[in-house]
Design a protein with these regions (language model features):
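Nucleotide-sugar-dependent glycosyltransferase catalytic domains
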Residues: 22, 27-184
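Substrate-binding/gating loop at the entrance of the active-site cleft, primarily
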Residues: 1-8, 103
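Short amphipathic alpha-helix
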Residues: 7-18, 32
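Alpha-helical hinge/cap motifs
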Residues: 2-5, 15, 94
Length: 184
C-alpha cells in the first residue's frame, strides 16, 4: 500500500532480510522508491492504474460502507495488474509473498500462483471476533446478504482469470493458517 503508515513499519524487516542475504522485491509507487531501496530492497514500480485509487472523496467514503463497491474496486485493481504481475512472478519467482493486509492483489496473486503468503498487518490483527468489535449488526448483515448477487458477479470475474475465490471473505479475511506479521 503506497502510504507511509503501511510502508515504514516494513522497512526494518526488509533491512533484516537483506542483511541475511535474501533478495526482497518491493512493489510500490515511485514515491517510496528511495525508502525501499535504502532498506536494501529491489524497487518494483507499481505505478500502474492498478495501484492508483483514482477515486473521488465520495468514492473514498463508500469504501468502508459499501461492500459491493469495495469488492468491484478490489477486483478491478487485481485484474488490471494480473498480466504484468503474473509475468514478473514467473521471471522472478519468490519463495514467499509478504503483502500488506490491504493489498488484496498480493494475497490473490500468491494464491493463484501457489506461492506461500504472509500478511503484513500495520494496524491491528483481524480474527474471527473482529467483526463484533468493529460493530457488525443486523442491518449490516442484511445489507451484506442483499449485495451477494452483485458481489458474486465480481468474484466470477476473478475466477475467470484463474483466481480460486469462493466468497468475498477469501479476499478480505485471512484464515487461521495464514502467517501474519503485526507491527506494534
Amino acid at each position: 500500500i503506497p502510504a507511509h503508515g503501511h510502508t515504514n513499519p516494513t522497512l526494518a524487516v526488509v533491512r533484516e532480510l537483506t542483511a541475511r542475504g535474501h533478495t526482497v522485491r518491493y512493489y510500490t509507487t515511485e514515491a517510496f522508491r528511495a525508502k525501499v531501496e535504502a532498506a536494501g530492497a529491489v524497487f518494483v514500480p507499481f505505478d500502474t492504474e492498478a495501484a492508483r485509487p483514482g477515486m473521488t472523496a465520495a468514492d473514498g467514503a463508500r469504501l468502508g460502507s459499501d461492500l459491493t463497491f469495495s469488492t468491484k474496486l478490489i477486483v478491478d485493481r487485481t485484474l488490471a495488474a494480473d498480466d504484468w504481475l503474473s509475468r514478473d512472478l514467473t521471471v522472478h519467482p519468490p519463495d514467499v509473498i509478504v503483502g500488506d493486509s490491504m493489498a488484496f492483489w498480493a494475497k490473490l496473486a500468491a494464491k493463484k500462483h501457489g506461492i506461500p503468503f504472509v500478511s503484513s498487518t500495520t494496524t491491528f490483527a483481524f480474527n474471527r471476533f473482529s467483526a463484533k468489535v468493529i460493530g457488525q449488526n443486523g442491518a449490516g448483515f442484511l445489507q451484506f446478504l442483499l449485495a451477494q448477487p452483485r458481489i458474486n458477479r465480481q468474484l466470477k470475474r476473478l475466477r475467470a482469470a484463474g483466481y480460486a475465490v469462493k466468497s468475498v471473505f477469501d479476499i478480505i479475511a485471512n484464515d487461521n493458517e495464514t502467517e501474519t506479521v503485526v507491527y506494534t
